Amino acid sequence: MKKFLFSMSVALVLLMSNCHAGNPAKTKDNAATSGSVMVLTNDLFKQKIFNYELNKSWKFEGNLPVIIDFYATWCGPCRMLSPIVEELAGKYAGKIIVYKVDTDKEPLLARSMGIQSLPTLLFIPVKGQPHSSIGAVPKETLEKAIHEVLLVK
């Protein structure tokens, strides 16, 4: 019985590692090309967007415009906005990168960016200052911000 359990454990570990090998970790580049919404942590934010610990004034670290969706799983308007954000990530794949931040899991990041209401979308152009949108807004309004703030057609 012990040999059987040990053999099954080894087989399970090998199977799990093999499954993982077939799914490469999403990076900023394949997020942009695949059109998926990526989860953003505080550490990744400091690396890819803005290191607020090193810089006092805004200095964007990316090379494509970014939308960051600050949300919470318990927030009704956040759940309404989520499919729209997913759709826009697909529509503008390769032109913008879309991230999401669960403010319950990343409270330091939310505080550091001054997020006080949910949902909050942060539109970050390659050059210039970020702009925010608070609340569940229509898709047309978000597309207008993509065109006017992020300068993406």
Question: Which stretches of residues belong to each language-model region?
Answer:
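Short pre-active-site segment immediately N-terminal to redox-active cysteine/selenocysteine motifs
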Residues: 63-66, 70-74, 117
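Structural signal for short hydrophobic segments within the conserved structured cores
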Residues: 38, 97-99, 130-133
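C-type cytochrome heme c attachment motif
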Residues: 73-80, 120
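Non-catalytic, surface beta->alpha helical segment in thiol-disulfide oxidoreductase systems
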Residues: 117, 122-153
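N-terminal targeting signals for export/organelle localization
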Residues: 1-43, 153
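A short beta-strand-turn-helix
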Residues: 40-64
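Thiol-based oxidoreductase modules, predominantly thioredoxin-like and allied folds used
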Residues: 70, 81-89, 93-108, 115
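Extracytoplasmic/secreted proteins, especially bacterial periplasmic and envelope-associated proteins
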Residues: 40, 44, 66-69, 80, ...
